[in-house]
Regions:
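Active-site neighborhood of phospho(di)ester-bond hydrolases with catalytic His/Asp-centered motifs
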Residues: 7-10, 36-41, 66-73, 107-108, ...
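Core catalytic region of metal-dependent phosphoesterases/phosphodiesterases
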Residues: 8, 13-115, 188, 192-195, ...
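Binuclear metal-dependent phosphoesterase catalytic core
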Residues: 116, 200-205, 216-269
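A short acidic (Asp/Glu
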Residues: 17-19, 47-50, 78-81, 132-133, ...
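Short, charged N-terminal beta->alpha structural module
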Residues: 1-21, 127-138
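A general structural motif
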Residues: 1-2, 31-33, 63, 117, ...
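Active-site-proximal loop/helix segment associated with metal-binding centers of metalloenzymes
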Residues: 90, 95-96, 102, 116-193
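Beta-strand-turn-beta hairpins that frame and shape the catalytic cleft
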Residues: 1-6, 112-122, 166, 223-229
């Protein structure tokens, strides 16, 4: 049974290093009782060759359970990759696994889960702003990187009016995008933000308490009850406690990094 849930952002293949960092900083953790949720771009299925298998083998040897939200720089998990869909009691829902690497588990592209007692919605996928660079330079780019339109419609339909304690995604709703982090050399008119627009509708279509995402390569609080992850690893329980306390006091720990928009809101601008 998983007793310790941790959250982190994009690892881009450096998974065993991220786990080593976790275990070195929290030596009291028992690997078999610990799970690390990666909010997309874990990179286990990026090269689709022996490099991926080495990555998986090194990570599997750590003994920590890994749960992956699908990002944009990785193939969709599924039968084509030699995986099977199983019911996972740790998360109260279906996950994809490979028999050779049972500690590495992949959420479905969207779905309902129960994680540490929290009613959870998981949403995978995003657009790659470097799509054309990747194509021009023969780098990996996955045509189905974004959530499929039929999945978006089904997700919207099945979440309407429902409550979720937690939303885990790779990208985020349009209004929560960290626009100050957009790359200056990328022409934003070429960026497909249809998924973020859809997620904005989704966010207003349901009730949710806490939203965690990655993709933009920064660790900080974006807005009340919304956090972005990259390199940091944090206890899910600590995150929940933080926002429960915030609702009671309106205060956050002074050292927490916050977005410019969040800072302006807190200063009353």
């Amino acid at each position: 049974m998983i007793k310790n849930w941790r959250i982190t952002g994009d690892t881009h293949g450096a998974n065993s290093l991220r786990i080593s960092y976790l275990l070195e900083n929290e030596p009291e953790l028992i690997p078999e009782e610990t799970a690390l949720i990666i909010l997309g771009d874990a990179g286990f299925n990026y090269y689709l060759n022996k490099k991926d298998r080495r990555n998986k083998a090194e990570t599997e040897a750590k003994g920590v359970y890994i749960y992956c939200v699908r990002g944009n720089h990785e193939a969709r998990p599924g039968e084509k990759l030699g995986m099977k869909l199983v019911s996972d009691e740790n998360v109260g829902g279906p996950v994809w696994i490979e028999e050779e690497f049972p500690h590495i588990r992949y959420f479905t592209d969207w779905g309902f889960y129960n994680i540490d007692g929290l009613r959870t919605l998981v949403i995978g996928g995003a657009y790659s702003v470097d799509k054309y660079y990747r194509i021009a330079n023969n780098l990996q780019w996955f045509e189905n990187e974004q959530l499929a339109y039929y999945d978006r419609e089904a997700c919207l339909r099945n979440t309407e009016g429902k409550h979720f304690d937690l939303v885990l995604s790779h990208t985020c709703p349009l209004s929560l995008q960290p626009t100050d982090l957009f790359l200056n050399f990328i022409d934003q008119s070429t960026v497909d933000n249809s998924m973020e627009v859809w997620m904005e509708e989704l966010a207003h279509n349901m009730n949710w308490k806490l939203w965690l995402f990655a993709h933009y390569h920064t660790d900080r609080i974006e807005w009340p009850h919304v956090e972005q992850f990259y390199m940091e690893i944090e206890s899910l329980n600590d995150i929940v406690v933080r926002w429960t306390r915030y609702d009671e006091t309106g205060e956050l720990d002074w050292w927490l990094p916050i977005s410019p928009k969040m800072k302006r809101m807190m200063e009353g601008e």
